[in-house]
Amino acid sequence: MLKLLLGDPNTRKLKRYQPIVEEINFLEEEISKLTDDELRQETHNLKSQISSESDIKQQKELLDESLPKAFAIVREASKRVLDMRHFDVQLIGGMVLHECQIAEMKTGEGKTLVATLPCYLNALTGKGVHVVTVNDYLARRDAEWMGQVHRFLGLSVGLIQQDMSPVQRKKNYDCDITYATNSELGFDYLRDNMSTDINEVVQRPFNYCVIDEVDSILIDEARTPLIISGQVERPQEKYQKASELALALVKAKEIGKDGIDPEGDYEVDEKQRSCILTDQGFAKCEEYLAVSDLYNPKDPWAHYITNALKAKELFIKDVNYIIKNNEAVIVDEFTGRVMPGRRWSDGQHQAIEAKESLKIQPETQTLASITYQNFFLLYPGLAGMTGTAKTEEVEFEKTYKLESTVIPTNQIRKREDLPDQVFKTEIGKWKAVARETAQIHRAGRPVLVGTTSVEKSELLSSLLAEEKIPHNLLNAKPENVEREAEIVAQAGRAGAVTIATNMAGRGTDIILGGNSDYMARLKLKEILIPLLVKPNNEHKPPIPKQRSSKSKGGFSSKVGSNLTKNIPDYSTSLFPCKLDEEIQKKLSVLSDELVKNWGDRQLSVLDLDDRIATAAEKAPTEDKMIKLLRESLSRVKDEYEKVLTHEEKKVREVGGLHVIGTERHESRRVDNQLRGRAGRQGDFGSTRFFLSLEDNLLRIFGGERVANLMNAFRVDEDMPIESGMLTRSLESAQKKVETYYYDIRKQVFEYDEVMNNQRKAVYSERLRVLQGTDLKRQVIGYGERTMYEIVEAYINPDLPPEEWDIAQLISKVKEFIYLLDDLKADDVKLLSIEELKNYLQEQLRTAYDLKESQIEQIRPGLMREAERFFILQQIDNLWREHLQSMDSLRESVGLRGYGQKDPLIEYKNEGYDMFLEMMTNMRRNVIYSMFMFQPKTDKDDKN
């Protein structure tokens, strides 16, 4: 009703931007007359004007005033460098981002290009801008591709990659605009706050940040905190024994109700992802291990057994993890990518290693941690882009104070979303998927099939191989990951079939007919790798292995001949045609030149990738080799383009890309992302989901209602079921899951909020120490506070002065400050409490000056170094112990709910007390260490 009366709030919001769009369009003609150098000068003038304003509010107003001109400059630069002009809707997207909101833009609407607008504008402050992507490949692609626009305008562009040294990182963070992944940014922040020298700190204070695929980072990954950990030795045989025991235990067929244990040794709750021993199971374990109590603190077993049971029942090989180089590597459930270097905590990873008979790595202890939620809230300006934000609008608003605005598409969507097909059994569903894939493939349309795990993608792969359908597989297996971009680049070719796990290639558009730019790069890579790359540099050839060797170009032979008559017989599985002799000769000359200049097999694969990517740019270059490479790339691309343009036309005629979903994801948003692959930028396309009543989502969250439906449907397994009740069950299951995970994220956020305030206090204290501004005053401050606390502890103001325990107080003071050895009770017994505090603080300052003169005689500057060392040492040690204590508190506090107490309030109160105690200990330990500090001198060494 309100919508009818007031109109759609999103539409009202968009109208507000229209006059600014008109102003930018008006400026376009004026800006287009400027030379390249004049454009750069405009940037310089704007930057000088904005960065010189020290008042933050005034600076923000200046930025807003400069927006039309800045956007017009970026649009012009983009036309000149990328041959891409921002549409009006993209300008609106840029304004939404500048206002620190989330811009929801459909797949293929050019989100990456939109980001150039607010990034350029906010970089004019000179405080740095971060562009965040979900993986290293996308960060590099965007820094190379969009970075051209910024470099052309005279701004510096940085890129953070996994294997960079601290020096390289610092240099890149100091650039005007820096591209990085969320995990690199987060870990650098934690490492900076563990460094012992200000020169080791790589990041500047945060300013403005744009997150690409914001839903993936702020929502999907919000449940997992970033943790830096150190190793702790734990007995490995316990993991092995627990793993053997888990195999011997019998799972209960159902979950116990009303406190009554079911038949079996343990029950599994898939929804809560937990395993609980029954009384019978406890007895069996105690007998097997010959112990009387699994929870005995001196010899605990319960934790090991629970982890072993979870490894057996809930952590499935090729779904949750894969085995690579004799290590268990985690697979991200949202992107389907492997996450090397990441490990499950609390001994869970070790339990999986024991289950798979791998070498068990030592357990770890947390040294520093932060959640993505609290990390990104450190940015004064935060904005994000995604194709799907509306489903999580409330969470963005509540947790991050971020509004979502839907940006209209530039062209009308022509995608057809076909009704779901639901099957009784999983095998019936997979057969139907294979049938539909074969049918669409034979019609000459490209097909993209999204699966939820490595295991399922390989099952479908084998079904298609039986049907002799050539296809590409894109999942977390190492041999497929390397070819991610290559596979997606050709996924739009006629009849191509691509199976992808959770659309791992998000970020690379599927272009109907195939992506000539990527194919040209790959052709050059194929020629140059054997000549330029070091032989020991591990690399798989980038040529996708089609599953059917007889077919050409990803088509069945019949389709290949019908659709692509102009493609010669000798086309390979990736490249659309053979290059003519003239181009081949040129490539041969190029190879010889590059070997002469870059050396025979001297580069790494990454180096070569970078150089080919630079050559693919349009940015000006003086490098002769890059120019040669660019010319060859252009020739190869033009050659491929001729064939692919014809192919694109054919693909459009038969209906465009068809996307098949094989399971509803836990989040409707991920389903929408998969659908969004078809029908980009007004292309034709279609989507359909195939589901079964045995799918995880319905099985775990659908409840008894779905189980009853299964029995009610007396239909064959390969007969699709259509039922309104079923569709409603499905939607309610999905909403249930979304609410369930939202509650988990909310809880993670609320608990981490307590840690966050403590973390900020500790990290700002550390930074003060690293910057070294007046360390002496800081340490004396610690000492004065300690003297104050000693007086408060030993003097009771309610007692008369003659009953005060002055002797005990003086003894305590001397424990901390041995230089006050001649201090006597008689010196202070006539003083009031305030006078006593002032007197002791005065004595402390005098003693500290004396200590300083002793130390400085040994070596000037040594006292400041000692102060820095002891403060950092104490902060780090006590913070590490505090993190451990807070973890234990969090685990135990949940039980207080049974005593009618709010666990979160209890956690806040006790956590605060523990934090105050930690800070007190830190101050006292520093004072004690400083006075006890006795450096060795040359005389000591001679003696």
Curated annotation (Swiss-Prot):
Region Disordered, annotated ranges: 535-560
Enzyme Commission identifier(s): 7.4.2.8
InterPro entries named among the record's database cross-references: Helicase_ATP-bd, P-loop_NTPase, SecA, SecA_CS, SecA_DEAD, SecA_motor_DEAD, SecA_preprotein_X-link_dom, SecA_SF2_C
PROSITE patterns: SECA, SECA_MOTOR_DEAD
Domain of life (superkingdom): Bacteria
Subcellular location: Cell inner membrane; Cellular thylakoid membrane; Cytoplasm
GO molecular function: ATP binding; protein-exporting ATPase activity
GO BP term, example: protein targeting
Binding site for ATP: 90, 108-112, 509
Catalytic reaction annotation: ATP + H2O + cellular proteinSide 1 = ADP + phosphate + cellular proteinSide 2
Compositionally biased residues, Low complexity: 551-560
GO cellular component: cell envelope Sec protein transport complex; cytosol; plasma membrane-derived thylakoid membrane
Keywords in alphabetical order: ATP-binding, Cell inner membrane, Cell membrane, Cytoplasm, Membrane, Nucleotide-binding, Protein transport, Thylakoid, Translocase, Translocation, Transport
Bilayer topology: Peripheral membrane protein
Quaternary state and interactors: Monomer and homodimer. Part of the essential Sec protein translocation apparatus which comprises SecA, SecYEG and auxiliary proteins SecDF. Other proteins may also be involved.
Function: Part of the Sec protein translocase complex. Interacts with the SecYEG preprotein conducting channel. Has a central role in coupling the hydrolysis of ATP to the transfer of proteins into and across the cell membrane, serving as an ATP-driven molecular motor driving the stepwise translocation of polypeptide chains across the membrane. Probably participates in protein translocation into and across both the cytoplasmic and thylakoid membranes in cyanobacterial cells.
NCBIfam families: secA
Membership in a protein family: Belongs to the SecA family.
Protein's UniProt name: Protein translocase subunit SecA
Originating species: Prochlorococcus marinus (strain MIT 9312)
